[in-house]
Amino acid sequence: MTVFDLPKIYTLFNACALLHIILGLVMIKMGQRKAHVASMTIALLFSAAFLGCYLYYHYHAGHVKFAGTGMTRPIYFILLFTHIPLAVLNLPMIIMTVVPAMRNRFDKHKRMAKWTVPIWLYVSVTGIIVYLMCYVWYGPPIRGWESGTG
């Protein structure tokens, strides 16, 4: 395995996190608090594993350029440019949602979760789509050193 295999792995982590976020939502709607906590904890762990792999990959692999052409480019960049700021915003929002729950402040937890969960879901889904567009459907991506642009 090389560093260039990491996008597959971190996207799998992202997909697992997405499934556990959805499961956690279903569980709390059904009144299954313990199952909700377990599922959301697993989602957090998968998200943390994703972030670690993602950062490691981009530190070692460098910049990658989208190889798609035509109308796929604006679609890709619209997804990417909505995904990135929401992904950055999402981490502190997740923390601000989890900490009150850990302190049994479920009123505050619920208020924050109403904002955090939709963003977390959007970031997870668009992250998977960005991966598919960049590495599977229109890839592989062009790395800066391969294109001669640095």
Across the structure, where does each feature detected by a protein language model lie?
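Alpha-helical membrane insertion/targeting regions
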Residues: 1-150
